[in-house]
Amino acid sequence: MLSQLSPQQLADLCNGQWYQGTIPSTRFIAAQIDSRLMDNNQLFIALQGGQTDGHNFIVMLDPERQQAAIVEQPAPQAAAAQLCVASSLHALQILSEEIANRTTAIKFALTGSVGKTGTKDMLHRMLTAFGPTHATKGNYNNNIGAPLTLAQMPEDTQFLVCELGMSHAGEIAELSAILKPAIAAITCIADSHIGHFDSLQQIADAKAELFSSFTKGGTAILPRDDFFFAYLEAAAKTAGASHILSFGTHPESNFRLTESLRVKDGMRLTVDYPYDKDETQTRSITFSLAMTARHWAVNAACALAMCAAAGLDVRTAATRLSDFGDLPGRGKTFDLTIGGNPIKLLDDSYNAGPTSMKAALDNLAEFSGQNGVILSDMLELGNFSTQAHLTLATQMTEVGISWVIAIGPQMTAMTDILPDGMKCICYPNSTVALSYLDQDLALLAERTDNLLVKGSHGSGAYLISQHLVKTYSTVSAAAEMHHAS
């Protein structure tokens, strides 16, 4: 889609000038913010970050490969053409909005306190059954990643899926204004990032910004089980949504999950969904999902609702999930052997908040045998942090955890109120924990059948999982994790 804009149109849109009048002779097919990923006919956006400045890498661009850059300060020694602008980030956002306005692809947007990245990945998988699909890579969902998704969209894209994240109020409104989605979903309202807010209501307000820039006739997809459903429904209507679909286990859900049974290779799900214009008649579909944690079942219902909102066949979409397996860091299981003892690792180390932590513990409880956990601090909880961590003590007692390795000051404080029979080992950070992890596990392995690793990315839980898979799993599993991380 970037190729629809000539170099001069790029300059006009961004209110910029090509350095020394050197205007490229060809158009660009995509933008990058990492010079190492640059390919032929691509445009490098030189951004100034906290630790790196993209302007330092302009000299690496190759004009012979039709590469150029958008810059704030030109590099006279660079051979590639440079478009000088006041703000490289603002230029990226302007170009992305122009692409969003020009595309004929159906534009999907989704956000939520938990589950948005996994739901995005499921939706992406489903949509590929119907045509070329372009989606947010990983969790590139902020004011850089979301515009970059648009700037990398191929010309033939029929379905565009953008994940929108936020840490503060107003951020989703800005991203929605760039994208102008036709179909917008909220997975749930929960306490992730609550440290930046005063209440869950404020989080609901911020998530509802998703509907602020609907295209005409937009459809909202909402979590029927959520406490804030009625509020979100009203917000979507006020924003001009012409249609609202709900998902969940609630009897009034349009896409109602009625069954989720764990089977050998994942889960078997049954979802009731409307098939007539007035949504008064329902059909039932049973399908397989190659995931093990039950919260993925509701996410699947959300993705199905998004497909239906686009007029796509629900049954065809559902078949795409039969091989949609557990994702590293989001509940994927690995078979470990520690000291001759077989242990199943539940790698949920991608991130953590109070709601997702409880879901992970509930999922662990469904596995038979003795269960251990390695938990690192949940971050960005602000004044709610202490209580959120202390609550875990009750939850772990209820699900019958045998032992815990606690990483970080908040998790360490939580262990003070655990029952005497639950063995605890505490470390100040993941670096120290890694130094002693092998000897700890040598002592704990005999009393462990299943092991959950979970925590915020910033507190290093993912480093623990990477070490466990690399050290105690098969070569193929280790390679799989490395490829996905």
Model regions: which residues?
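Rossmann-fold NAD(P)-dependent oxidoreductase module
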Residues: M60, E98, M122-M126, R320, ...
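Acidic, Mg2+-coordinating active-site environments of NTP-dependent enzymes
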Residues: A75-A79, A185-I343, G369, T394-W403, ...
